[in-house]
């Protein structure tokens, strides 16, 4: 048993993911989390007053009120004023980390019911001018910094995230054609899952304003299901000459949020919640930052070891698709079964709003595991700076 107490997921919802500068661009990360949290509270029949803690992961802090994010989410959805809130940042693992931190609070009996979430509005990432607060020298050429682009570069190793994926492509002999074929598969699997309604249980529709008036958004906006291999092959590589990473086989810059409500076994019984899944275990691992994308390998292995399970026990595996060569390197290193890995597509198709992806992956695994009648699933993400995080869940149906 990897956890000291039984911890159960009693609700798991996410917003549709918006394209960069798309339908969700005017919603802050706080707004997006509020939508997901309200949907989760409603779906799980969880009264807000039963929430003991609010934990939300967010990376870019792109809105002016971002410092208050988790607190504002809690207050907006009716969580008692006396209940504390925490906004955390483990980069692309932040959505997963919110659940991990929630489990830790429950296991230490600091909380019984925790509203967890992950969120990002990449569209709202501002441009900034640094070092002007105390005046500038005559003639100084002020530089306008794109905080989004700057945030996707690891200054410690002086590499943009895309180059760490190129390093993995070289290390694991991943070709450009491999990457484009995988990107096409991600789009096609997303299309099939979307048309079959496999995202319906996790989705929290949002009313958005368009040129044609208000409409309900309930489908991921970034996905390009009509993409062909020929189109992908024509795209130029972005980070190095004759490289593998293109705009078509990398995760999409996007906006979105997810909310996962977890509760102790005692709380499930006390409040008569319906458990959807049990949190079996988790693991966080560091790795070489120049190949940060390999992080899911030690993370998944660590989580499985703690839980006394193996990859063969997993009915579903979901590894965040930061870049196609990154995912393919993880797949090769772990010898993942393609038939049960990223079965509904991933971030290459639907986008990767940094803090939101862990919550999205968890929500999808919860509902997809139940739909398929499977037992175990593991979700994982690589993390900029050289980390990996993994979370194992068990179907309770």
Curated annotation (Swiss-Prot):
UniProt GO molecular function: acetyl-CoA C-acetyltransferase activity; acetyl-CoA C-acyltransferase activity; acetyl-CoA hydrolase activity; fatty acyl-CoA hydrolase activity
Positions bearing N6-succinyllysine: 25, 45, 137, 143, 158, 171, 191, 209, 211-212, 214, 234, 240, 305, 312
Modified residues (N6-acetyllysine): 25, 137, 143, 158, 171, 191, 209, 234, 241, 269-270, 305, 312, 340, 375
Residues that, per the record, bind CoA: 224, 227, 251
Subcellular location(s) per record: Mitochondrion
GO CC terms, sorted: ciliary basal body; mitochondrial inner membrane; mitochondrion; nuclear body
Residues of the transit peptide: 1-16
One GO term of the biological process aspect: negative regulation of mitochondrial membrane permeability involved in apoptotic process
Record-stated family: Belongs to the thiolase-like superfamily. Thiolase family.
Name this polypeptide is given: 3-ketoacyl-CoA thiolase, mitochondrial
Gene name in the database record: Acaa2
């Amino acid at each position: 048993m990897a956890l000291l107490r039984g911890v159960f997921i009693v609700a798991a919802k996410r917003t549709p993911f918006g394209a960069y500068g798309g339908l969700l661009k005017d919603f802050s990360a706080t707004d997006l989390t509020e939508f997901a949290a309200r949907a989760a509270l409603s779906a799980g029949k969880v009264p807000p007053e039963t929430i003991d803690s609010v934990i939300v992961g967010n990376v870019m802090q792109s809105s002016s009120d971002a410092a208050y994010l988790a607190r504002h989410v809690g207050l907006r959805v009716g969580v008692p004023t006396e209940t504390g809130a925490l906004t955390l940042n483990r980069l692309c693992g932040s959505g997963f980390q919110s659940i991990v931190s929630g489990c830790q609070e429950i296991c230490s009996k600091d909380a019984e019911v925790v509203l967890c979430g992950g969120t990002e509005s990449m569209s709202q990432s501002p441009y900034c001018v640094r070092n002007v607060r105390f005046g500038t020298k005559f003639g100084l050429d002020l530089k306008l910094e794109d905080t989004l682009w700057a945030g996707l570069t690891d200054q410690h190793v002086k590499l943009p995230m895309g180059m760490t994926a190129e390093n993995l492509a070289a290390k694991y002999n991943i070709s450009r054609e491999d990457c484009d074929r995988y990107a096409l598969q991600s789009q096609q699997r997303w299309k099939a899952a979307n048309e079959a309604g496999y995202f319906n249980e996790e989705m929290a529709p949002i009313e958005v304003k368009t040129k044609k008036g208000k409409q309900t958004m309930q489908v991921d906006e970034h996905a390009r299901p009509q993409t062909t291999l020929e189109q992908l092959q024509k795209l130029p590589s972005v980070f190095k000459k004759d490289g593998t990473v293109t705009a078509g086989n990398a995760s999409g810059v996007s906006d979105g949020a997810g909310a996962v409500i977890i509760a102790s076994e005692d709380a499930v019984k006390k409040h008569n919640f319906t458990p959807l899944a049990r949190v079996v275990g988790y693991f966080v691992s560091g790795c070489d930052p120049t190949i940060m994308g390999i992080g899911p390998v030690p993370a998944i292995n660590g989580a499985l070891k703690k839980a006394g399970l193996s990859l063969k026990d997993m009915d579903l595996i979901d590894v965040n698709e930061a870049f196609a060569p990154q995912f393919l390197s993880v797949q090769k290193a772990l010898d993942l079964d393609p038939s049960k890995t990223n079965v509904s597509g991933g971030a290459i198709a639907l986008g990767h709003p940094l803090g939101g992806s862990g919550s999205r992956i968890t929500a999808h695994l919860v509902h997809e595991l139940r739909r398929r009648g499977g037992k175990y699933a593991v979700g994982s993400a690589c993390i900029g700076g050289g980390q990996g995080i993994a979370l194992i869940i068990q179907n309770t149906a």
